[in-house]
Each structure stands twice: as structure tokens, then as C-alpha cells.
């Protein structure tokens, strides 16, 4: 059976969770989260996880599954998500992928190759080389695998090192190996609204995070875990950690959270516009819910017919 996955994405703060709750009133759905930070336990406020009431209304998967200091990547996400997807279908429910992490979306719709084992020696050498000559790894990637370089952000050292590791270990480009693992068809629904409205929602959400206890959440985390973890470089956490370290005041920290979140939302939209056949809706428009319910129902009916 050729499964057509349903993905609902959009910039942070646009209202994906709120819309999903509304859709659940019409369809028997379960959500597979596509948020690379909501997978971590104890990081609730700063990652804007669904609240207990929303989680009660709609079953969510891939939230609170690992500790902040545990290793996780897009390959593991893809593997776990597909198993959960099968279980949801067996229960007669509709699996809906929801979130804005581009790497997870790529893992599902483009495939994500991870067959080459990690080589810590190569990784250490590459990291050392990068420290000695900043920017050299980017140049190497552009030379060895231009296609991968075009997809990987210049500041994304994790993916840069992984791509170079695969090439140095196998002599093959990771971009070519990934093409061997193409995923099935998908329907990508993108939520977006007027930029001024989106930015205002982001600003208000940042203030509410502080009101709801983000500072205490960060304090508890860095008491239990190393504050230099990559996990804590997440927007909202890194700024509060710097505030707690006395680098700047709370007002500046809040300003930076707002600004950095707006910049992140803009990058998400740039990424999502690459998908030519995506379907875009404004979640604030009254007819949006009905249209998306129709789309999901159509895919689900098609799936049911294929099973018959």
C-alpha cells in the first residue's frame, strides 16, 4: 500500500496545535509531533508543548520521549514515527504529522540516510579542523558534495560533519545515498498568516512563557544537566541561561527571545516555500478548518479504499 502521509506545518507560533484540536472534533486523529525540541522531557514552557488539556483532547506522540542529554537525530525520528504511524492506522485512527522542524519533514518526504555508522575518530578530527580553521568544513562540503551543501545551513555543524563523515568513510556523497531512501507520497498543509499578526503572536507568547515560569524551568534544568548541552541552545533557553549568568538583564533576554523566534519563523517559511505542491491556509480564516478536514477526509477515504 502506498501510504500518503498528511503533514501540517507552518512557522512557530502560527497556531498549529489550536487548529489540530479543532480538527479532532470532526475526525479521529492522533498527532505525531514533528518538533525537534518537544521530544525532550522537562522542556515544556520554552518549547510551547501542548498543554495538558490539549493533550487530553488529542493524543500526541513523539513528545517527552528522551532526556535533554540523550542523543537523537532525524533517522531515529523517522524510524520511530513510522512505527507509531502503523500503530495509529491499526487502531483505525488517522495519523497527522504536526510541527515545523525541517529536518524531520525532510526525513519523511525525502528520505534520510543514516546507514553509515558514526566514526568518532573522523568526527573528532573534523571538529578539531573546524576549530583551527573556521569555515574550512563548509568549503570541504561544497567541494565533495555540492548538493548536500546547498541544503545544509552554513552554521549547521552537526549536519555538515555528518555529511563529511559519510563521504570520508565511504567515498560516497550523502546526498546520493539519501536518494536511495525516498519516502512515500505526502500532503503538506502549511499554516501561515499576515506577518504582523504572526510576529505579534510570537511576541505575546514569549511574554507568556516568562509569566508561566520559563526562568524557573531553566533553573531546574541547569541544576540537573550541563548548561552547555546543545539542547539548551534552543531559543528561549539559551537567552535565559545567559540572563542567569549575568550577561544581560531580563528585559534584554525577552527582547532576544522575541527577535530570535521571529527570525526562526522567517527561516521556516523560506524552507516551506520550497515545496511546490504544498497547500497554504491562514488558520485565522473561518473556512480553513473545514477545508483541511475535507483534505484529510479525502486522503483517509482513499486509504480505506486501497485497503479494501
UniProtKB/Swiss-Prot annotation:
Binding-site list for ATP: 10-17
InterPro entries: Dimethylallyltransferase, IPT, P-loop_NTPase
The reaction(s) this protein catalyses: adenosine(37) in tRNA + dimethylallyl diphosphate = N(6)-dimethylallyladenosine(37) in tRNA + diphosphate
Keyword ATP-binding: yes
Site, as annotated: Interaction with substrate tRNA: 101, 123
Keyword set, alphabetical order: ATP-binding, Magnesium, Nucleotide-binding, Transferase, tRNA processing
GO molecular function per UniProt: ATP binding; tRNA dimethylallyltransferase activity
Binding site for substrate: 12-17
Sequence segments annotated as region (Interaction with substrate tRNA): 35-38
Keyword ATP-binding: yes
Cofactor (UniProt): Mg(2+)
Domain of life: Bacteria
EC class name: transferase
EC number per UniProt: 2.5.1.75
GO biological process, alphabetically ordered: tRNA modification
PANTHER family: TRNA DIMETHYLALLYLTRANSFERASE
Family: Belongs to the IPP transferase family.
Entry-linked NCBIfam families: miaA (TIGR00174)
Entry function: Catalyzes the transfer of a dimethylallyl group onto the adenine at position 37 in tRNAs that read codons beginning with uridine, leading to the formation of N6-(dimethylallyl)adenosine (i(6)A).
Subunit composition and interactions: Monomer.
Protein name in the entry: tRNA dimethylallyltransferase
